[in-house]
Amino acid sequence: MASSSSSSLSFSTSKKNKTFFKKPNSAFSSSRATSLIKRQQTVFKKAKELSILCDIDVCVICYGSNGELKTWPEEREKVKAIARRYGELSETKRRKGSVDLHEFLEKMNKDDPEKEEKKKIKVRRVPKVKYPVWDPRFDNYSVEQLMGLVQSLERNLTRIQHRTCAVVEAQGQRRVQYTNMANQELMMANTMNQLQQHSNQVSMYLWNHGNGAFSQIPVSALASNQTQSLAPIPPELMIYPNSDAGNYSGSLGVQGTGINGLQNMNMLTYNNINSVNDFSKQFDQNSRAESYSSLLGVHEDGNNEFENPNMSSRNNFNVQDCAGLLGMQGAGTNGLQSMNMHDYSNNNSINSNGLSHQYVQFPTYNSQHQDRVFNLDQNGNNTRSL
């Protein structure tokens, strides 16, 4: 049994040896020969490029697998000349600049331990520089000096802890301030949005003189278009230039209760032409009046103070304020004092509300009875009893 096992072991060993030292077959050797030929061509090409670029003499001597000699350059005379010159050099010059593979590997193995030791020293020095654990100067310190050093280190440690707490607290306060500022900005933004929404719901009322009614206009309509303008002013409400008036109250509304009425008013060529309803709706140029209240309004009590049946109550003047406009003194405080009227023409119009006659060159009328009301006919006579 043992003999059989030993024989089998020897057989396997011999078989392995035969397999390990087996000569390469012809196919394998041919591939290697092909690879060698390609490598030789590459080496010869590089030698040629090197000789051209560096302008030097280059020689390559190579023996093939079959012992055949191949050189570059192919001219054998040039190869022999280069080899002769190289042989004439001394041993030192021959070794100069030459590289031997065996020597190169030995040098690399010799340098590696030195480099490793340098790296280890560098690694050991870095922690000592960053975090020194001991100083050689402490070796000669006494116990008292070492205790003082410990106390100094403790004081510095306490100071650093206080500083750290102060920095952390300051950062917390800054964070709270930033949070408060952000909340305030958010509240302001919400407030502005609420105000804007509220303004969109608010509307304004405008009096329309054309149809005598209020019209409701949202403020948002005006705010959305800043360039949008209001409707043009009707011609009947326009105030022409060169008018000096202290007060226009009542010119578009109900009669006021002005104290002065018209004082010392010079009226030149005031034309009331073809007025269907009231007086002409334009104020004469170069007219001076302290108060225009109740020019277009009705009497406060709604009664017709004039006995002219052609005048409706809506065109009556406020006799308490401007009753003297046509030369009639009302019950106002001042009426018309020292009033000169020149060429005041109420052109014969078809209206049944105003005065349908002309009054030309009335003399100066000094008011003495301020509590009387006069009604004049077409000749300028008073038709109302005093």
Swiss-Prot record:
Keywords: DNA-binding, Nucleus, Transcription, Transcription regulation
Single GO term (MF): cis-regulatory region sequence-specific DNA binding
Location of the MADS-box domain: 29-76
Family annotation (Pfam families): SRF-TF
Compartments (UniProt record): Nucleus
Record has DNA-binding as a keyword: yes
Main location: nucleus
GO biological process: positive regulation of transcription by RNA polymerase II
Record's GO cellular component terms: nucleus
InterPro entries for the chain: MADS-box/MEF2_TF, SRF-like_MADS-box, TF_MADSbox, TF_MADSbox_sf
Quaternary data: Interacts with MEE14/CBP1.
Cited function: Probable transcription factor that may function in the maintenance of the proper function of the central cell in pollen tube attraction.
Record protein name field: Agamous-like MADS-box protein AGL103
Species of provenance: Arabidopsis thaliana (Mouse-ear cress)
